[in-house]
Amino acid sequence: MGRLLDTIDSPADLKKVPVEQLPALCQEIRELIIQTCARNGGHLGSSLGAVEINVALHHVFASPQDKLVWDVGHQAYAHKLLTGRRDAFRTIRTEGGLAGFPERHESAHDAFGVGHASTAISAALGMIEAKRVTGEPGKVVAVVGDGAMTGGVAFEGLNQAGYLGRNLLVVLNDNEMSISPNVGALSEWFSKKFASRTYNRWRRQVKEFLESVPKGPEAIGIIRHGINATKALVTPGILFEGLGFHYVGPVDGHDVKGLVETFQKLAVFDGPVLLHAITTKGKGYHPAESDKATRGHGLSFFDVATGKPVKKSPGAKAYTDLFAEALCEEMEHDPRVVAITAAMLEGTGLIKAKQRFPDRTYDVGIAEQHAVTFAAGLACEGIRPVVAIYSTFLQRAYDQIIHDVALQKLPVTFALDRGGLVGADGKTHQGAFDLAYLRCVPGLVLMAPSDENELRHMLHTSLQHDGPAALRYPRGAGEGVPLEPARVLEIGKGRLVRNVPGKPDVCVVAAGTTLKAALAAAEALAAEGVAVTVVDPRFVKPLDEALICAEAARAKRVVTVEEGCLAGGFGTACLEAFERHGLLEAGLGVRRLGIPDEFITHAEQAKQRAWVGIDAEAIAAACRALVGDRKARGVA
C-alpha cells in the first residue's frame, strides 16, 4: 500500500482523507521532513512540532480562499508538502529549489512572505480587514509560534485585532522555545501556569462539575458566572481576553483529530479567537526532542540515526565562534563588558558567554528594539554593552540605533553576524543592507574585518572607543590565520596589503572578507601582466580617504568590492571621497562591485557571490575591462 501523502496534491485532496487516517499521514510527513532536512539542512524542530496543526488547518479550511499566515515560517514545511509541493520538497533550500520559508511567488497557498518573527497577526488582520472592505469571502488564520509572542509587534497586532473585533483566528503554537528557550516574564508566566497543580486540578474539577450539573439556561448562567470569576486567577487566557480575544485552550497540539474538531467549531465563531496549542519542538524525532538548547532548530546536514551533524573536513573556525571567544576574553579582562542578544544565544555564539558570565549575558527574547535601547541604558551608566545580532534582524531596531544610541553618542558595540550573503536561508536573511544603513548614521564607527585577527582587533577597538561602533562579519569559516593578541586599531586608517613597484594598472579596494577574492584576482592578473594594488579599508566609516584616494590617483583606475548592496554602500562612500578630492574630474576610472538592486535568492554562498559578481573571477574581469576601456580611449 502506498503512502497517504502521495495521494495529496492539494488541500482539496487532504479533505478526502478520513480523520481516522490523519495520524498516519502526520507520521509520513514527519519522516519526509527528517530525511530532507538531514540532506539539505533546515528548520527541523519547528516543522516537526507543527505537523498536526498544519494538517488540521488544511483539513478544515479552504486555502487559498482561506488565508493561512505563518509567523516566521519555520513551522511551514508540512504546509508546503500539503499544497502541491511534495515532489519538489527534496529541493528545499537548494539552488533553483523551494525556499525555506513561505513566499507569495512560490505558491498561491503562501498568503504572506515571512522569515522574520512576530508579523503574522498584523498581516492576517490586514487581510481580514481587506476581505471586509471588498466583500471577498474567506477566513484568515495566523499561526504564531517559535517564541514570536515575545516580539512587540505581535502584541500591537493583537491590540488592534481585539479592538476591531473581526473574525480572526490566531493559533498560538506554544512549544516553550523560540530559537533558544523562550525568555521573559510572559514565557515564565505561561510555564508556571501549566505546571501548577492548582491550575490543572481546577480544570479537572470544573470539567467534572460541568458533566454533573443539570442542563438549562439558569444553571448555565450560574456556571458561567462562577467560571469567569475564577479563571482570572488561574488561567493564562485572561491576558488575551483582556485584549478582546476569546481564548480557547490550552489544547494538545499533537492531537490531530481533536484539532480538526476544534478548528471546525472555531471556523464559525464570531469575533477574534486565540487557540492555545501546546506542542513539542522536534516532536517525533528523539535527537531533536532531547536537544534542550535548540530542539533541532536550524540544522545543517546531519545523520538521521543519531541526529549528529555530518562532520566536514577540518577547517578554520567559523567567524561566529571566533567572535564569541574574543568577546569572552574581553569580558574576562573588563568587568564593564556585557553581552546582549535577541533570542539568538546559540546562533550568535553568546551561549559561550552565558555559560562563563551568566550575570553579564542577556537574552531579551525576540525584541531587537528593546535590546538596543536596553544597551543604551546600560551605556549611560558606564557599562560597555555588546549587542550581538544577525545583520538582517538589526534592521528592526534602526530607529533605536539612531535615536537612542548614536544621537547620544553612547558607547554601544553592535556585532553583526551574517553580514553579506548567507546561503540557504535566502532572501529574508541576507545581510545585504547594513553597510548602507549604518554608514549614514552620524558618529557611528563602522568596521568590516577581513580575517579573524581583524575581527579580534575591531572588537577590542570598539570597546575602547567612546562612542557607538559596529563590526560586521560573514556567515561561515574564517581564513585560518594564526591568532594574534587583540590590539587597538587607529580609527579611520586602512592598510595597503598588496603593492607593486612603479605605477599600478588598477587599485582594488576590498571591504571586509572580499579581500581574499581581491588578492586572488590580483595574483591572476599579475600572470597576465596587469599590475594590481589592493587596499583593505578596515573602516567603512570613517573612511581612510587619504590612503584610498592616493592609491586610486596613483593607478588612475579603481575597483571597489563589497559584500553589501551597491546603493549607498561602501563603493558609494568611495565615490563620494573621489568626488571631494577631484579625482572624478581628473578622469579616474571607477567600477563598483557589490550586491545589485535585487533580493538574492537561496543557494550556496559561493554561488551567490558569483551571481552578484564579487568573486575572484568577477573582480579580475572588472579590472580587465577597466584597463582595456581606458587604453582603448588612449588614457594611461
UniProtKB/Swiss-Prot annotation:
InterPro entries: Dxylulose-5-P_synthase, THDP-binding, Transketo_C/PFOR_II, Transketolase-like_Pyr-bd, Transketolase_C, Transketolase_CS. GO terms for cellular component: cytosol. One of its GO terms (biological process) is terpenoid biosynthetic process. The keyword Cell cycle does not apply. SUPFAM superfamilies: Thiamin diphosphate-binding fold (THDP-binding), TK C-terminal domain-like. Keywords: Isoprene biosynthesis, Magnesium, Metal-binding, Thiamine biosynthesis, Thiamine pyrophosphate, Transferase. Mg(2+) binds at D146, N175. It catalyses: D-glyceraldehyde 3-phosphate + pyruvate + H(+) = 1-deoxy-D-xylulose 5-phosphate + CO2. CDD domains: TPP_DXS, TPP_PYR_DXS_TK_like. Its EC number is 2.2.1.7. One of its GO terms (molecular function) is 1-deoxy-D-xylulose-5-phosphate synthase activity. The keyword GTP-binding does not apply. It is an enzyme of class 2 (transferase). Catalyzes the acyloin condensation reaction between C atoms 2 and 3 of pyruvate and glyceraldehyde 3-phosphate to yield 1-deoxy-D-xylulose-5-phosphate (DXP). PANTHER family: 1-D-DEOXYXYLULOSE 5-PHOSPHATE SYNTHASE-RELATED, 1-DEOXY-D-XYLULOSE-5-PHOSPHATE SYNTHASE, CHLOROPLASTIC. Belongs to the transketolase family. DXPS subfamily. NCBIfam families: dxs, PRK05444.2-2. This is 1-deoxy-D-xylulose-5-phosphate synthase. It comes from Anaeromyxobacter dehalogenans (strain 2CP-C). The gene is dxs.
